[in-house]
Amino acid sequence: MKFLLVRPGPTFSVQDVAFGWRDGLRELGVNVADMNFDDRLDFYSSAHIDRSAGEGEWIKAFDFADAMSLANKSIESVCYEFWPDVVLVVSGHFVRPHTLALMRARGHHVVLLCTESPYEDDRQLAFCEYADTVLLNDPVNLEMFRARHPDVHYVPHAYNPAIHHPGAGTPELKSDFAFVGTGFRSRIEFFEAVDFDGLDVILGGAWVALDDDSPLAPLIAHRRDWCMDNTDTAEVYRSTRSSLNLYRREAREGEGAHADGVAMGPREVELAACETFFIRDPRPESDDVLSMLPTFSEPAEVRPLLDWWLAHDREREDVAARARAAVVDRTFRNNAEWLVRHLTKG
């Protein structure tokens, strides 16, 4: 079986999901072509030409609409050189419906992996008609999707054992508390209300919305306009004594889009896989799978929880080990194995 994997446009966060699926499929012996849609979109969006006969007057070669068209044409080019059985589109927000419709019309089975449920389910719902199979990262709107499409499934977030595993950590990254994630406004407001005084804290991720005078600014471990890749993030997890999972509150306003998800997010699974202790922003699935980990509901609850657990090493290490055992089977390989089985049944 041959898969063409179309990476998402953004080069952070959901890119880790794409690489996880790619590697999981390859572990099964599947022939996977990794289509770097992100690089191509960046290239066409960034290309400039000199219109001044060497005088240095540079203009953009393409506006964004044209850049998207050219990047989408490159998907077609790769597809018809490789001719896959399955096209796995991760996220797909920058892939045009025409591109998917063309591949379906020529007999390729198009799988759309939706990574933004339920926050952007309005957009994902409108897009799913162009796929043969739709995979959701949260089941809260599963029945709504199934009312519109005959082959929709919830596939849980997963981790890559080569990246997310227990370990001693790195001395330079040792901390009392670490959090890696996008600095959405809701998260900024939450963390600014947490008492971190006296704790060694590391924050990572894209925090471009953070004000210069925020008390969180000195805690960012890199430039605020940078991201932290998954390998570095896992090392931060292994090096810290505690962490926290906090879901964003931002969501689109269309049909089905909201922030009240059911499923565990990717960071919860990755933290548990690294055997890192963390406190939870509760959700039904994590309440079921990770009930051994404590929960919080407001910023004022965070510091007392951290103080108690940081003072009790044995108890903290015990629940972290139990959390790892609870997610040990949630690998990309297992998700990939399910998908191959689903596509080849009958």
Question: What spans do the regions from the language model cover?
Answer:
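N-terminal Rossmann-like NAD(P) cofactor-binding module of classical short-chain dehydrogenase/reductase
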Residues: 88
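Catalytic alpha-helical scaffold of carbohydrate-active enzymes acting on polysaccharides/glycoconjugates
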Residues: 76-80, 100-102, 120
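Short, amphipathic alpha-helical "lid/cap" segments that border enzyme active or binding sites
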Residues: 72, 76, 299, 303, ...
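Membrane-proximal helix-turn-helix segments that form the acceptor-binding/catalytic region
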Residues: 117-132
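Nucleotide-sugar donor-binding catalytic core of glycosyltransferases
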Residues: 1-57, 64-70, 74, 81-83, ...
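A charged, aromatic-enriched C-terminal amphipathic alpha-helix characteristic of glycosyltransferases
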Residues: 311-342
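Active-site proximal beta-strand in glycosyltransferases
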Residues: 102-117
